[in-house]
Structure formats: structure tokens, C-alpha cells
Design a protein with these regions (language model features):
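Short beta-strand/loop motif that positions the catalytic acidic residue
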Residues: 238, 244-246, 250
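Alpha/beta-hydrolase-fold enzymes
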Residues: 126-216
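An N-terminal hydrophobic leader/cap segment in hydrolases
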Residues: 1-42
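Conserved alpha/beta-hydrolase "acid-adjacent" motif
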Residues: 251-257
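Catalytic nucleophile-loop/oxyanion-hole region of alpha/beta-hydrolase
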Residues: 59-62, 88-117, 291
Length: 304
């Protein structure tokens, strides 16, 4: 597995797909300097009507959410995101997580940078980022606040909350063993063709130099499975308003995991939407306009 660090150039005119973002860095509790991006809301909405703190998915980076940021900005909503350690322009071995708690520290640092006094803010995560956001909210924010402010809600886009239905139990157990004895074993690759039905999205991903196209190390995959089990144990305590959406034809994360989470979460205000025919990235798929419209509507309804 490649262990190179990301480019250090974070100047406003540096290359990368972060159009419109204000760039800086934020330091985690364990001393990692993460690349931080803030897409401001439209000029007519300052301060913004709401702020969304986003954790991206495995092997991608925050810049892929620039189109989402533009749509949110039109609605007066600010988007703030980091490149998780080992992703995008943040330092560290590519897509390596010695523990899922490393990503939780990244998310904690993001929230510290994203929260504004008197502005409603939302936790959001896509795919593995959804795992991180859900685990953080359930373990650390049940009946509590983040940086002195209680989040207005939790938004999960195609979250990785359960192993695939076709994955046998022995394979899950074997992944834990391999993670211990050969943690950097190249376990799998992500096929861009499974992201969306839009060929332009697939090709853009294939050609994006900040996306990790190599194999995912066994330890990282095993730690995501560990996070799933931790979420199962604590989800009943999660009392924030929750929005979960997933594509019915997602082959990268399990839609049934979202259904089960919505049934078992402690929140009395949980909305689940399964988009028929959509692949993994519903916000980039052919029906993305209605997906993002529904997201904006939900945020607006929970920002009062």
C-alpha cells in the first residue's frame, strides 16, 4: 500500500476541485493538520441560515462536494468539511486508519471549526463519513452538545452501517484476523462504476488525482466493521433529529443497514428515504436534483 503524504500546497490558487471554498487547516487532538474547507452561503445570507459539517467517504475527499456546496449556498446554508487524514490534501498514509477513533478525532476537529454561535449546525456524513458521524453523535452527543452547542440534526447519506447481506460471517471474522496479523494487506478496491449511473460522475472520479484508486488496507476495513458494532450498541441513545437517505441499488454500502438504523435509533424524529434505482452517491446520481432539494427542505425545517 502506498504511504505517501498529500500535497502541502493549500494556497487559494492551488490545483484541486474545491471551487469557491475558503481553505485553511485545523489541528486534531493528536496533532494532525487537516485540510479544512468552508463554502460560504450566498451573500444575502450572512450569517448563514445553517451550517453543515460534512465527513466525506472512504478514499475520496471534500472537494467532491463542491456541487453540493453550491446548491446549499443558494439556500443560505454553509458547508464546512475536512479532508480526513490520509485523504485528499491531508497528510498521512493513504486511506489508513489504525483505529476508527482517529477519524472521530478528525470529525471532532471539524466540528470545532464549523460551529458558529447562534447558527444552527448539522452533522453530516456520506458512506464511511456517515459511519463516523453516526458513531460520534451516538457515543458523544447523546443528550449533550458539541463545543457548547447542540446540533440541530444528523444527516446520513448512504451510510456504511451494516455489512453487505451477501457477506458471510466467516469472511467478517477473517477480516478481523487479517487486520491483526497483516494490517496493511490490500483487501479491496472501490469500483467507480458503482458510484452513480451518470457516466460523467464515474469518469470524473476515475481521473481525480485526489481520489485514492488503490486498494484499501485490511485494518481500515476492519475498523469500519468495528464502528458498525459500536453504533448498534449505542444508537438507541441518539435523540437528535435524523435524516437518512440511500439508493436502492447501492452495491457499496448496504441499504438495509439504513433501514435498520432508522427503526432502532432512539430519535423520535427520524426520516428515511430510499431512492429507487439510485446507486451509492445519490447526490451525484441522475436524480440528484430532487435528492438535494429534499435535503435542503429538511435542513430548513429543522433550523428554526
Amino acid at each position: 500500500m502506498a504511504t505517501f503524504d498529500a500535497p502541502s500546497d493549500l494556497s487559494p490558487d492551488s490545483a484541486g476541485s474545491y471551487a469557491g471554498a475558503t481553505r485553511s487547516t485545523v489541528r486534531t487532538a493528536d496533532g494532525v493538520e487537516l485540510a479544512l474547507y468552508r463554502w460560504c452561503a450566498g451573500q444575502a445570507a450572512f450569517p448563514p441560515k445553517a451550517t453543515v459539517a460534512l465527513a466525506h467517504g472512504l478514499a475520496e475527499h471534500a472537494g467532491r462536494y463542491t456541487p453540493l456546496a453550491a446548491r446549499l449556498g443558494e439556500a443560505g446554508i454553509e458547508l464546512v468539511a475536512v479532508d480526513l487524514r490520509g485523504h485528499g490534501r491531508s497528510p498521512g498514509p493513504r486511506v489508513w486508519a489504525g483505529s476508527i477513533d482517529e477519524y472521530l478525532r478528525d470529525f471532532e476537529a471539524l466540528l470545532g471549526a464549523a460551529t458558529r454561535s447562534r447558527t444552527p449546525f448539522f452533522l453530516m456524513g456520506h458512506s464511511m463519513g456517515g459511519t463516523i458521524a453516526a458513531l460520534y453523535a451516538a457515543e458523544r452527543l447523546a443528550h449533550g452538545a458539541a463545543h457548547g452547542q447542540r446540533p440541530a440534526g444528523l444527516i446520513l447519506s448512504s451510510p456504511a452501517l451494516a455489512p453487505g447481506r451477501d457477506v458471510p460471517r466467516w469472511m467478517i471474522a477473517a477480516s478481523q484476523l487479517v487486520s491483526r496479523v497483516w494490517p496493511r494487506y490490500p483487501a479491496m478496491k472501490i469500483d467507480p462504476a458503482l458510484l452513480a449511473r451518470d457516466s460523467a460522475v464515474v469518469e470524473a472520479n476515475r481521473n481525480d488525482p485526489l481520489v485514492h484508486h488503490g486498494p484499501i488496507p485490511a485494518r481500515t476495513g476492519a475498523e469500519i466493521l468495528v464502528a458498525m458494532k459500536r453504533i448498534e450498541r449505542v444508537r438507541a441513545a441518539l435523540d437528535l433529529p435524523v435524516l437518512v437517505f440511500h439508493g436502492s441499488d447501492d452495491k457499496l454500502t448496504e441499504p438495509e443497514g439504513s433501514r435498520e438504523f432508522a427503526r432502532e435509533v432512539g430519535s423520535a424524529d427520524c426520516t428515511l428515504t430510499i431512492y429507487e434505482g439510485s446507486y451509492h452517491e445519490t447526490m451525484n446520481d441522475l436524480d440528484r436534483a430532487r435528492v438535494i432539494d429534499a435535503l435542503i427542505e429538511w435542513i430548513a425545517a429543522h433550523s428554526g
